[in-house]
């Protein structure tokens, strides 16, 4: 008997697919580890993200970044080939990525339908794709995570053309490996539509059972154990056609959603059963208010009730119905415009009790869009969105709320008048918005000065393309082939390419204006660049993950030439800390007379990069935890090829510092070719206090120098800052620190050196300075400089360096590591510069300033199965602050590390507060400052452990007041004395540096500092 149910006809609807194929004798799993297949799976239409799966050391791969508040955040990917591919169910995985199941026939070997599974990371980057083929036709309908961390796929299978249909069960691991497959069926046809995990580790499947000899179909419920063996089954229904659509757990039993053919035989009614854990009916409810009602999806809500999504009315409105646990209907809501068909296929609940559906909306007779709509907990419609391209049909099959507050949707789309569909994965924000317009293009060396891209013209990688619309700014970066791709909202944008330095010029200095009128638009804009100055521009970076006493330390040195011509005979000079001993290097090293090591790089082409490793050993003796180790690298040529500032007098200041017995000696030297025309000043900081009386001024002739001597350093850390003359090229900040200068056996103060930046603001200089640690966390974030004092204060012009350290603390080798770091709003994402790393990686910056770093094929051994070097990894990147950050701005930063498919691990948080240097540094003398003529104050011992004595000489006082402050200026002690000798006990003072004031009769006598051990 012909099914008389009403149909809607779409030219590309899946219902018209027919298949003819031979049977395969064994299950076939196609795993698209080959990147070409992964690219083929992604239909590169405007809604798709371009994927470049390469592993270049310090290679900037395609990224999308939104610096302003865009109207929509999200993406849409299409997976498929030239035949039928559809998505039916989606999950967000524990690593915050996604796994999608459905069916496809584009990439199998026998032209039939197979189960199709795609796993992506949080940004939609394909991790793997697989096909599962055990017969003539296989289709997946649902997927759930199992208790052991794997996944169960439930669907249907037909072994041979004309054979009956069975329920098909597959269990796969996190990498898509097949653990087992099983079938369930009898003499008739059994089909599955949904599955739910049970508390005993097993699972229950809902579907339909059709009698072999009759047309009657019933709702089928099957209980399976954890290994896929059926323990019992039951059917429910009427003498007419009944179909089981969705299942959810409620209490100790289940709620079953199905459709039952009404008495007219033309349309369905919705049927809802609540059953106990053995399948016995507790209550039954029906919705039969109009000619047509269909249930598609059911969930258990936070209040213990049930929510249903489906279709109502002949003209098809989307339907949401809310029940309590006893089957009492709380409310019913239909969503639909007059004369516009809408259907709901899936539903999800948010933390506030609101509900979101997905399905389809018939925009016109030839255009169907994906529907997303939200209602509050009482059923009031909050918003409704239609996502789709006028040239394509899109339908949402499943929806889940994401941890980020948006939604992930799967389904299918297909082009108008095209029989075949593609699986789609759509990510939206919390309002159902997504970005679908894309601007692509090429950035290249314009050798013929025609400003259009010709074959043979060299691509430029790592260049930033900026798109501006009002206050909204979006960025893209070119990949290794010079290609960029940016997702944009609608509107008028100015696109401009930003050269990495001033040695380059571009064809379009003012940019190109583009108008994006509609969604799913696509434009191609190429940018040519040429040399403004023929000069190399060398950059260098050196890093190691951490320093540990008496250990091997491997430094990674990266270098690049972002200039316009080849750097001839380039080399890197390396200076090691005296606590480090050179062992070997992956590049031949020359020992220089001054103790430095020289590594010859040869010729480095424009836009070329490279790296090498330097192995060292850190001393076992005479090294304290918290003490620093410093290594500096300088790459040559370091030529400055632009016009010089006319104010510059050709002087160039360098500073040096040494500990000589009981004295710290700083040297300031002019190594430039010109004499200084103006006097400049230096600042000396002892630990974290600016000294008075020793800060030098200088006006040096070429080659001349001065010394600054500081006696009796008492183990403190001293740092000198010096100024360059006005107009000095580059960003040089002459500074040097001397740490641990004390008599043998005397204690030293550590932890002070890294609070200030080093002189490596110029790209051709890199300084790695770290505190020696006794232990390292399995994931850690290090920020440099760490900032001054308890508030970690830095200047508004200080660049920040971030190093992420990670160790494989699991029991299995890790193949892939991803780091995601959401930058503070005070950091300029466009200034992110990738640095050294333990392994090859690629870096992306996108959305509101998320830095994503991916290590593919890292092969990181478990901590208990290899040496530290093979269990740890690290990566460094640098970024500048946004201009004019106001005083008081707080910069917080924290990274998340993803090891393969595990739960992500968060690092510590690093924090800074912005102020103006040197205003935020307390200003005191090296020991004290006396404000009363003829008075002297002796302090002994200082530093002290239990008690310190302050003895006033030169004048008799009857009463003295002593105020003790911490470094933030907070008064923490106040004491009074009736003689000129003041004994101050440590009491509860923690180790550290404190300032004090000595006062008598309202007059300030003396200020200074106390050092507590």
Give the label of every model feature segment:
Residues 145, 197, 300, 349, ...:
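Residue-level recognition of secondary-structure-to-loop junctions
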Residues 120, 172, 224, 275, ...:
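Hydrophobic loop/turn residues within beta-sheet-rich immunoglobulin-like superfamily modules
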Residues 71-437, 446, 480:
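A sequence-level/structural motif corresponding to short, flexible coil/turn segments enriched
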Residues 1-3, 26, 31, 38-39, ...:
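C-terminal outer-membrane/trafficking sorting elements
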Residues 433-927:
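Exported/extracytosolic protein signature
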Residues 224, 275, 426-433, 530-532, ...:
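Short beta-strand-to-coil "C-cap" segments at the C-terminal boundary of structured domains/repeats
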Residues 1, 6-74, 557, 927:
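Bacterial Sec-dependent N-terminal signal peptides
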Residues 119, 171, 223, 274, ...:
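Hydrophobic beta-strand positions
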């Amino acid at each position: 008997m012909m099914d008389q149910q009403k149909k809607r006809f779409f030219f590309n609807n899946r219902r018209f697919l027919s298949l003819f194929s031979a049977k395969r004798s064994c299950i076939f799993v196609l795993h698209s580890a080959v990147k070409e297949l992964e690219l083929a799976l992604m239909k590169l239409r405007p809604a798709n993200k371009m994927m470049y799966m390469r592993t270049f050391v310090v290679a900037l791969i395609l990224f999308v970044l939104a610096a302003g508040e865009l109207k929509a955040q999200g993406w849409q990917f299409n997976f498929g080939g030239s035949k039928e591919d559809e998505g039916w169910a989606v999950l967000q995985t524990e690593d915050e990525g996604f796994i999608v199941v459905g069916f496809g026939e584009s990439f199998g070997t026998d032209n039939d339908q197979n189960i199709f599974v795609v796993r992506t990371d949080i940004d939609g980057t394909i991790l793997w794709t697989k096909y599962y083929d055990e017969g003539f036709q296989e289709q997946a309908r649902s997927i759930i995570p199992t208790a052991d961390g794997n996944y169960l796929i439930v669907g249907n299978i037909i072994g041979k053309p004309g054979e009956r249909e069975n329920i098909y069960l597959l269990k796969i691991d996190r990498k898509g490996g097949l653990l087992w497959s099983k079938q369930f069926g009898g003499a008739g046809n059994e089909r599955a539509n949904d599955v739910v995990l049970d508390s005993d580790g097993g699972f229950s499947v809902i579907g339909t059972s059709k009698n072999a000899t009759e047309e009657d179909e019933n709702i089928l419920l099957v209980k399976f154990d954890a290994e896929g063996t059926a323990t019992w089954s039951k059917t429910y229904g009427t003498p007419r056609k009944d179909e089981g659509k969705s299942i959810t757990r409620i209490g100790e039993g289940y709620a079953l959603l199905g459709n039952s053919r009404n008495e007219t035989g033309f349309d369905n009614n919705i049927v809802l059963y609540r059953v106990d854990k053995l399948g016995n009916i507790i209550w039954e409810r029906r919705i039969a208010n109009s000619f047509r009602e269909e249930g598609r999806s059911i969930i258990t809500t936070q209040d213990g009730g049930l929510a249903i999504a489906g279709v109502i009315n002949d003209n098809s409105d989307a339907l949401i119905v809310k029940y309590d646990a006893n089957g009492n209907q709380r409310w019913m809501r239909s969503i639909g415009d007059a004369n516009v068909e809408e259907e709901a296929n899936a539903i999800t609940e948010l933390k506030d009790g609101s509900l979101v559906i997905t399905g389809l909306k018939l925009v016109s007779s030839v255009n169907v869009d994906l529907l997303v709509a939200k209602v509050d907990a009482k059923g009031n419609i909050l918003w409704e969105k239609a996502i789709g391209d006028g040239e394509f049909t899109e339908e949402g099959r499943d929806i889940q709320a994401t941890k980020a507050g948006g939604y992930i949707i799967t389904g299918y789309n297909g082009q108008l008048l095209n029989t075949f569909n593609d699986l789609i994965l759509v990510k939206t924000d919390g309002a159902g918005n997504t970005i679908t317009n894309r601007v692509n293009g090429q950035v290249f060396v314009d050798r013929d000065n025609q400003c259009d891209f010709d074959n043979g013209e060299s691509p430029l990688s790592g260049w930033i393309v900026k798109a501006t619309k009002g206050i909204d700014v979006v960025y893209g970066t070119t990949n290794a082939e010079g290609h960029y791709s940016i997702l944009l909202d609608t509107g008028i944008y100015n696109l401009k390419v930003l050269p990495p330095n001033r040695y380059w010029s571009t064809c379009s200095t003012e940019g190109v204006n583009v108008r994006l009128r509609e969604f799913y638009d696509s434009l191609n804009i190429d940018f040519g660049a040429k040399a403004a100055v023929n000069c190399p521009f060398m950059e260098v970076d050196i890093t190691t993950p951490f320093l540990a006493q008496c250990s091997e330390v491997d430094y990674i040195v990266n270098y690049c030439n972002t200039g316009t011509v080849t750097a001839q005979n380039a080399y890197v000079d390396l200076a090691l800390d005296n606590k480090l001993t050179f062992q070997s290097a992956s590049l031949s090293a020359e020992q220089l007379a001054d103790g430095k090591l020289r590594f010859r790089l040869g010729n480095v082409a424009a836009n070329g990069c490279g790296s090498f490793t330097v192995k060292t050993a850190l001393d076992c003796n005479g090294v304290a935890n918290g003490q620093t180790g410093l290594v500096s690298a300088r790459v040559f040529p370091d030529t400055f090829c632009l016009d010089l500032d006319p104010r510059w007098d050709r002087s160039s200041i360098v500073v040096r510092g040494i500990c000589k017995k009981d004295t710290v000696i700083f040297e300031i030297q002019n190594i430039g070719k010109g004499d200084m025309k103006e006097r400049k000043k230096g600042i000396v900081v002892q630990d974290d206090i600016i000294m008075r009386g020793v800060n030098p001024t200088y006006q040096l002739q070429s080659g001349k120098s001065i010394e600054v001597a500081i006696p009796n350093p008492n183990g403190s850390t001293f740092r000198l800052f010096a100024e360059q003359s006005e107009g000095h090229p580059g960003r040089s900040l002459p500074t040097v620190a001397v740490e641990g200068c004390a008599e043998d056996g005397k204690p030293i103060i550590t932890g002070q050196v890294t609070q200030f930046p080093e002189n490596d603001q110029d790209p051709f200089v890199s300084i790695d300075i770290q505190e020696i640690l006794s232990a390292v966390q399995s994931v850690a974030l290090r920020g440099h400089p760490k900032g001054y004092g308890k508030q970690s204060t830095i200047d508004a012009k200080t660049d920040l360096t971030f190093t992420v350290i990670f160790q494989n603390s699991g029991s299995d080798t890790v193949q892939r590591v991803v780091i995601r770091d959401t930058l503070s709003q005070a950091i300029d994402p466009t200034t992110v510069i990738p640095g050294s790393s333990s392994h090859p990686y690629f870096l992306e910056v996108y959305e509101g300033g998320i830095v994503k770093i991916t290590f593919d094929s890292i092969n990181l051994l478990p901590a208990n199965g290899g040496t530290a070097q093979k269990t740890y990894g690290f990566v460094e990147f640098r970024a500048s602050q946004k201009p004019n950050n106001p005083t008081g701005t707080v910069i917080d930063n924290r990274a998340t590390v993803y090891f393969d498919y595990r739960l992500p691990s968060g690092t510590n948080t690093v924090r800074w507060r912005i102020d103006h240097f040197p205003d935020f540094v307390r200003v005191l003398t090296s020991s004290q400052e006396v404000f009363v003529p003829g008075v002297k104050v002796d302090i002994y011992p200082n530093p002290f452990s239990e008690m310190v004595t302050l003895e006033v000489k030169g004048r008799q006082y009857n009463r003295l007041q002593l105020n003790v402050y911490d470094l933030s200026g907070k008064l923490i002690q106040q004491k009074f004395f009736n003689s000129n000798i003041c004994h101050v006990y440590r009491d509860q003072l923690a180790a550290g540096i404190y300032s004090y004031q000595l006062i008598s009769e309202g007059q300030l006598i003396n200020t200074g500092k106390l050092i507590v051990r």
